[in-house]
């Protein structure tokens, strides 16, 4: 076999248009599609052949074409405008972050994720987490937030999906050609490719560093596929979520530990805080602690407190299986030489990744590791925050589940990435000037009402026609490859109708997402879809993990249903779901169907992408829709009820779905005026855009992260670093508290048990607290009350701080009182408790210390 050396020959950009090269190497273009239109003008055919990849295009376009457009006045006018916009964007100091937090402009937020969905040309993502992470970086750039991203570069990317004639998913991995992408190697001081390493048992794993520019944000990716590694180690970063548990622990050591060292030791950055997304990067906590111990010469416990002030953890999963749990022997293999460097024992190390208790054989949980150390923790929707507090309540067994220190920041989308270009033009015309810079404000979206119905509907129909053309191409290719004749294929695709009510369902095919729920009652669905004069089309797309047999069975079943005579040409299953396909779907269907098994959807963002494009949501009240639904902006499936079995839940939800389709959605869609427009439909469509456009953008999401998590931690960690002695004192305070907490006694003073009073009255309650070995300034006493159920559970809890009225210093007894407001009728329960208090205590629940009154 011949071996060839590779030489890349690039056409030379004329000086007049040389900025095409710089902008092509910055993913700013992925949400500024005006730039991409320049390439269409240079050579439309080549642009399509290059799959709309500007870097690849500039390597293949002829020198003649470049010279020609560099003298084209019309082209140059547009080029100059776009170049100016790019320069202004990259160099502007007038950003949201700079204006609101000028004193924090030198801070750095390091954002870690195992996957990033930035653009279809860079397939290093698999699903929701990746798309969210990509959108997170883009909005951080828009808002001027000083953020840097860290991830892994998967040369195989995520798999390409084919669906054969039997409906079976086939997976295909292909190497990404990095030289055709806006990904560039980072250079060291000598101009060579930067290579770092991380320690593995008896060897080093070497990693090449790559960089992607995402507007003003830099994303660094680590790559083990280099000659310095053995063949096995070269595969560490080959596939996303591939391999066995040992491969996963290797990947997560690289992401977390090598990622920290890349930033701090090799790039000379000093991140103020670190943001972990899922438990994949949780090992970064250990590297941070190790570095603090070495730098500050402090104990493990003090270093852990400082690390807590530097870390945010976001959980994106609503189920225990969503967190990696590594066998103890595997953890020992990779960390037995590490925990001595932290100054702790094997048992102390292993317990960092376990819930409290004596069992050391339960496995090392990456989610628990992050929860135990991170100073701030959050879920990704209001409901998911509550689910997460319950899910991880045993990490803080003494704390009421509803008070576990896990908050929430509801996910959003990077609007300009997902907004159809024609809609963007329409919004530019009717919304306020500079709406894109202020999209997180609700008032911006009120102007949607001013868009004439016919103009909005016309754009929607245009998007729908484009989607139908794509469905025809995708289906034709899939069926042709499977041996279907031209006549058979044409019989199916010719039935696609832009006037038909079109419902879309596209997402990862996990079983809890219930992709086949709509077919629960095939006979009823047959009646619904074959109603003369009111046609319906269903379009499905999505991948199942290669190891998920049940998910693949769902795909197969949808294929089989789509080939039933009564559904042929009305149900379509598209293959190779990716960002490009998603853009067509979320802007081209009429209704976005989402029916996960509640409450197992952490957030879900596909419906947010749909709503900003005027596609109306039809969803279970789960994830973001549980807080986004307003009764006038879409439809719901089922209720908030809890069921004894999945079968009962599926039956109830499917019946609700059919009823809403028959009684609300279909009649509303087909109730047209003389211009062929449904006024009621347009009203719901506009309400959908107005109520979700700002609230569910990543612009709003990043504002929330910054205000609620990033800035408080940035300011706290700087205080910690400025006075390590205070941290040591705080650590000693905690140790003393743990030793003496059991001695606290609470006695109720005035007993109102089993009394009856009128609604609207207040009662004054009091208790005596005995503190044998704890200073009274180190605690807070609270009244804890709410409506009490027959089973003794108190709901709708209110917590009121109590006032210190009397002190008996000799006997260490203190008397507290407060008033309880009982505004509405019902049965109430109340009690008292003691909680720790310290100015350096970020979240009281983190200590897992609470003393309740006992008889």
Give the role of each language-model region.
Residues 1-855:
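Catalytic cores of carbohydrate-active enzymes across secretory and cytosolic contexts
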């Amino acid at each position: 076999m011949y071996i060839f050396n590779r030489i890349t020959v690039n056409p030379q950009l004329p000086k007049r248009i040389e900025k095409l090269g710089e902008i092509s190497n910055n993913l700013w273009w992925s949400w500024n599609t005006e730039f991409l239109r320049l390439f269409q003008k240079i050579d439309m055919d080549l642009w399509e052949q290059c799959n709309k990849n500007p870097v690849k295009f500039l390597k293949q376009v002829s020198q003649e074409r470049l010279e020609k457009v560099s003298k084209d006045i019309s082209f140059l006018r547009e080029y100059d405008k776009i170049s100016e916009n790019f320069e202004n964007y990259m160099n502007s100091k007038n950003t949201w972050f700079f204006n609101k937090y000028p004193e924090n402009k030198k801070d750095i937020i390091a954002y870690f994720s195992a996957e990033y969905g930035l653009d279809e040309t860079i397939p290093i993502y698999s699903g929701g987490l990746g798309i969210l992470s990509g959108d997170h970086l883009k909005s951080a750039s828009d808002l001027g937030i000083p953020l840097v991203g860290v991830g892994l570069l998967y040369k195989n990317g995520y798999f390409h999906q084919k669906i054969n004639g039997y409906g079976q998913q086939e997976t295909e991995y292909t190497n990404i050609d990095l030289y055709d992408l806006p990904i560039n190697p980072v250079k060291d001081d000598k101009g060579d490719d930067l290579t770092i390493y991380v320690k593995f048992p008896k060897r080093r794993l070497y990693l090449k560093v790559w960089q992607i520019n995402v507007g003003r944000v830099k994303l660094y990716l680590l790559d083990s596929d280099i000659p310095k590694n053995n063949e096995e180690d070269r595969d560490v970063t080959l596939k996303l979520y591939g391999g066995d548990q040992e491969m996963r622990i290797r990947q997560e050591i690289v992401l977390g530990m090598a990622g920290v060292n890349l930033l701090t030791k090799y790039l000379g950055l000093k991140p103020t805080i670190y943001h972990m997304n899922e438990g994949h990067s949780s090992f970064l906590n250990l590297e941070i602690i190790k570095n603090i111990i070495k730098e500050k010469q402090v104990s493990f416990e003090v270093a852990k407190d400082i690390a807590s002030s530097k870390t945010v953890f976001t959980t994106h999963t609503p189920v225990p299986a969503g967190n990696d749990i590594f066998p103890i022997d595997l953890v020992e293999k990779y960390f037995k030489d590490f925990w001595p460097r932290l100054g702790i024992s094997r048992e102390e190390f292993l317990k960092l990744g376990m819930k409290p208790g004596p069992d050391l054989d339960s496995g090392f949980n990456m989610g628990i590791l992050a929860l135990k150390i991170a100073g701030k923790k959050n879920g990704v929707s209001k409901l998911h925050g509550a689910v997460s507090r319950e899910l991880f309540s045993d990490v803080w067994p003494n704390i009421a589940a509803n008070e576990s220190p896990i908050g929430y920041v509801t996910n959003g989308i990077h609007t300009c990435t997902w907004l159809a270009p024609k809609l963007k033009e329409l919004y530019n015309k009717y919304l306020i000037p500079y709406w894109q810079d202020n999209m997180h404000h609700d008032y911006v979206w009120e102007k949607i009402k001013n868009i004439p119905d016919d103009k909005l509907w016309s754009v929607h129909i245009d998007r729908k026609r484009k989607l139908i053309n794509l469905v025809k191409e995708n289906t034709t290719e899939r069926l042709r490859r499977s041996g279907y004749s031209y006549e058979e294929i044409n019989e199916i695709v010719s039935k696609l109708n832009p006037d038909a009510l079109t419902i879309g369902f596209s997402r990862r095919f996990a079983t809890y997402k219930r992709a086949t729920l709509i077919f629960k009652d095939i006979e009823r669905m047959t009646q619904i879809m074959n109603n003369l004069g009111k046609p319906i089309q269903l379009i499905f797309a999505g991948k199942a993990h290669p190891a998920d047999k049940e998910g693949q069975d769902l795909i197969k079943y949808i294929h089989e249903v789509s080939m039933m005579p009564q559904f042929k040409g009305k149900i379509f299953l598209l293959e190779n779901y990716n960002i490009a396909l998603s853009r067509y779907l979320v802007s081209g269907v009429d209704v976005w169907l989402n029916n996960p098994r509640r409450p197992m959807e952490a957030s879900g963002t596909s419906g947010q992408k749909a709503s900003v494009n005027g596609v109306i949501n039809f969803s279970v009240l789960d994830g973001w829709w549980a807080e986004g639904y307003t009764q006038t902006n879409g439809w719901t499936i089922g209720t908030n009820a809890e069921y004894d079995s999945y079968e009962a839940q599926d039956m109830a939800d499917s019946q609700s779905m059919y009823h809403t389709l028959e009684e609300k959605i279909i009649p509303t869609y087909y109730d047209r005026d003389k211009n062929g427009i449904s006024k009621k439909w347009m009203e719901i469509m506009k309400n959908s855009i107005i109520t979700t456009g700002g609230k569910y953008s990543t612009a709003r999401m990043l504002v929330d992260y910054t205000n609620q998590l990033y800035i408080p931690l940035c300011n706290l960690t700087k205080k910690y670093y400025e006075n390590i002695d205070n941290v040591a004192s705080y650590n000693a305070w905690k140790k003393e508290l743990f030793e003496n907490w059991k001695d606290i006694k609470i006695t109720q003073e005035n007993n109102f048990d089993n009394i009856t009073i009128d609604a609207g009255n207040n009662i004054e309650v009091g208790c005596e607290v005995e503190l044998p070995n704890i200073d009274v300034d180190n605690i807070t006493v609270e009244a804890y009350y709410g409506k009490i159920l027959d089973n003794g559970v108190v709901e709708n809890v209110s917590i009121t701080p109590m006032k210190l009225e009397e002190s008996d210093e000799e006997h260490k007894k203190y008397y507290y009182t407060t008033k309880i407001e009982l505004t509405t009728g019902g049965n109430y329960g109340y009690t008292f408790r003691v909680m720790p208090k310290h100015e350096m205590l970020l979240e009281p629940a983190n200590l897992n210390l609470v003393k309740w009154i006992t008889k």
